[in-house]
């Protein structure tokens, strides 16, 4: 379980990114967070693995505080958290296989991984992960030779090879076309269902949130204004999240035909 206890984030310029967030996400959930740009979605997501440090409160993972964790303890906790970015975050000149093996770095010494000395078991896991997202044939291609959708699937394979217990996906389909968007989200959903990996995804599209989430969390101005099951997320609720009906109506356009 991931638990946010009175979590707030204030940036150096005084902007409040998060305001007294109290939230529990159970193991195996597929949670989609929605809200306008600047609502606090990325800040909340990235605070889980401390890519963004909070200024108040505490974040617990399986009863252990990642907020207070240091050194080896922090590295161990981060090893269980896979991160998927909008920009893919791949080493473009490296092969797909090497990018996926980067998910194993936290399990070995720096020297060993720098020299690329991964055991046979890691290689097998990397190949299995690529097969899982239907991109095994690209294992020896350079990452920059792949389409955007293929690169994002490499990112998912990296999280699988990492054997992550939690996957955080920050706007993973924002730069993708509708068909590729469906493929990437289908992969994330199937992995969540098959392996029970807790998955938190930030999305702008209300239609996609309704299609894939088991639970939707709406943020507005750094605060949670909605937290409920998909069937509870009515148009009226989304109007509250997005602040005005015109914006809501635009976002309600079907993203995947």
Swiss-Prot record:
GO terms for cellular component: plasma membrane. It is a peripheral membrane protein. GO terms for molecular function: ABC-type phosphonate transporter activity; ATP binding; ATP hydrolysis activity. ATP binds at residues 35-42. It is found in: Cell membrane. Its EC number is 7.3.2.2. It catalyses: phosphonate(out) + ATP + H2O = phosphonate(in) + ADP + phosphate + H(+). Coiled coil: none annotated. Residues 2-246 form the ABC transporter domain. Keywords: ATP-binding, Cell membrane, Membrane, Nucleotide-binding, Phosphonate transport, Translocase, Transport. Pfam families: ABC_tran (PF00005). Transmembrane segments: none annotated. Part of the ABC transporter complex PhnCDE involved in phosphonates import. Responsible for energy coupling to the transport system. The complex is composed of two ATP-binding proteins (PhnC), two transmembrane proteins (PhnE) and a solute-binding protein (PhnD). Belongs to the ABC transporter superfamily. Phosphonates importer (TC 3.A.1.9.1) family. This is Phosphonates import ATP-binding protein PhnC. The lineage of its organism: Bacteria, Bacillati, Bacillota, Bacilli, Bacillales.
